[in-house]
Amino acid sequence: MAKALSLTIFLFLLIASNVQSARLLDEVQTQPQLVPQVPEEEDDSPQAVTTTPTPIPLPGPATGGPEPILEFFMHDVLGGSHPSARVVTGIVAQTEVNGIPFSKSSNNIFPVDNAVPLVNANSINNLINPNTAPLLTGLSGSQANTVIQNSNGNSQGSLSSNNLPFVTTGQLPPIAALQQLMFGSITVVDDELTEGHELGSAIIGRAQGFYLASSLDGTSQTLSLTVLLHEDHDHHDTLDDAISFFGVHRTASHASHIAVVGGTGRFEHAKGYAVVETLHNQEDQHVTDGHDTILHFSVYLTYYKA
């Protein structure tokens, strides 16, 4: 009896455990699906950055930029006993001079047909004298009374010395304006350069070149100059520190801008520009019997050999 009861209880418990196991097996818990994470690809292509260029103002007095790298004063002396400027082409008053070289043949000089005579010491007084030399006004753009000379046709003492003669206004054609006579005249210069404009200022070099009257109204001079800065050494024995300029100097304006086109020495391959100002009412600053025009150069360089 006891064994039958024990067997019954054992079977009951066995069946109950099987039922519980089957129920647990049927209840499958839903597992979350694992999705592999793919790393984001980095964009290696460079990003285009748009920047607006900022304009760089040119240095100079108008923009309040840096100070000029160099300043000097050029003295252009016309006439007198020691001129630094001489005319080489231009209009003269007498038509005989306009005919040089002559179109007529002369057997007195060349014993051949159609020869062209040369000017000699005997004929020079009849051709060129202080009253037939070209008219100049210089870099100041205005004619000075001290420049015009008249020695009544006498060339002695003028052509043989450093005096530079000029025509008088009475010899000019009545219908020709002064500006029209100036137009096209070329003047070569070998002017002194000083540190300041005042009397006795130290000489730092020379300006050599020429200027051309390039406007019909007489207010423009085309400059082509090379400034030689020898300062404390002999510029004939050493390489000069030189700057070359080219541009138009407008005598009617307060200041003009001309280009720096090159240089030598420490200014080799120089680039930039110069502001040129004409100093007025400076006639009594220097001892000279000619007309001294003073130009103030302020040089601004964007590149030069230090």
UniProtKB/Swiss-Prot annotation:
<comment type="similarity">
    <text>Belongs to the plant dirigent protein family.</text>
</comment>
<dbReference type="GO" id="GO:0048046">
    <property type="term" value="C:apoplast"/>
</dbReference>
<keyword id="KW-0964">Secreted</keyword>
<comment type="function">
    <text>Dirigent proteins impart stereoselectivity on the phenoxy radical-coupling reaction, yielding optically active lignans from two molecules of coniferyl alcohol in the biosynthesis of lignans, flavonolignans, and alkaloids and thus plays a central role in plant secondary metabolism.</text>
</comment>
<dbReference type="Pfam" id="PF03018">
    <property type="entry name" value="Dirigent"/>
</dbReference>
<keyword id="KW-0732">Signal</keyword>
<dbReference type="GO" id="GO:0009699">
    <property type="term" value="P:phenylpropanoid biosynthetic process"/>
</dbReference>
<feature type="region of interest" description="Disordered">
    <location>
        <begin position="36"/>
        <end position="61"/>
    </location>
</feature>
<dbReference type="InterPro" id="IPR004265">
    <property type="entry name" value="Dirigent"/>
</dbReference>
<keyword id="KW-0052">Apoplast</keyword>
<dbReference type="InterPro" id="IPR044859">
    <property type="entry name" value="Allene_oxi_cyc_Dirigent"/>
</dbReference>
<feature type="signal peptide">
    <location>
        <begin position="1"/>
        <end position="21"/>
    </location>
</feature>
<protein>
    <recommendedName>
        <fullName>Dirigent protein 24</fullName>
    </recommendedName>
</protein>
<comment type="subunit">
    <text>Homodimer.</text>
</comment>
